[in-house]
A protein has these predicted regions:
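Bacterial N-terminal signal peptides that target proteins for export
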Residues: 1-10
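C-terminal segment of classical bacterial N-terminal signal peptides
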Residues: 14-24
Length: 169
């Protein structure tokens, strides 16, 4: 009897041990705040205007159809995240990592993307009117039908013309 109890306890310990030493899981229910870990979370259709998400971990997170108007995502790590139809007018994404992120049909009017890594990001039909892209890394980014009218281009000098759809002209 003692042997079977001891064996059961040993087996339970072996099963539970990996849980004790595994990295902490993202707190998808945690409130917005600097450094929040929302990796792999579904935060679609959320109201987060003026949220402070500086240096947040947002890998593969879905913000589809959410409102992030005037939110601060400076230094955030949002690689492969989804911002489809997200309202991000006036948002700050300075110095953030958004490689492979999808901003299709997002409204980034007047947003600041200074020094952001946007390589391989998608901006299909996005609105980037008056956005500041100074110093942004846009290698292989896709601006198909994106409205770049009045945007400040990556060199920090060129202002895109009113006919800038899909490319800064």
């Amino acid at each position: 009897m003692k042997t079977s109890i001891g064996l059961s306890l040993l087996l339970a310990a072996l099963i539970l041990m990996p849980l004790a030493i595994s990295p902490a899981l993202a707190g998808c229910g945690d409130p917005p705040g600097p450094g929040v870990d929302w990796r792999n979370c579904n935060l679609s259709r959320q109201e987060m205007s003026k949220a402070d998400l500086t240096k947040a971990t947002l890998w593969r997170t879905s913000f589809n159809r959410s409102t992030l108007t005037d939110a601060n995502l400076s230094g955030a790590d949002a690689n492969r995240s989804m911002f489809l139809e997200t309202k991000m007018a006036g948002a700050t994404l300075d110095g953030g990592r958004f490689t492979y992120a999808d901003f299709s049909r997002a409204d980034l009017t007047g947003a600041s993307l200074k020094g952001a890594n946007l390589s391989r990001a998608r901006f299909h039909n996005a609105i980037l009117r008056e956005a500041d892209l100074t110093g942004a890394d846009i290698r292989d980014a896709d601006f198909f039908r994106a409205d770049l009218s009045g945007a400040l281009w990556i060199d920090g000098k060129k202002r895109c013309g009113e006919d800038s759809v899909g490319a800064c002209r």
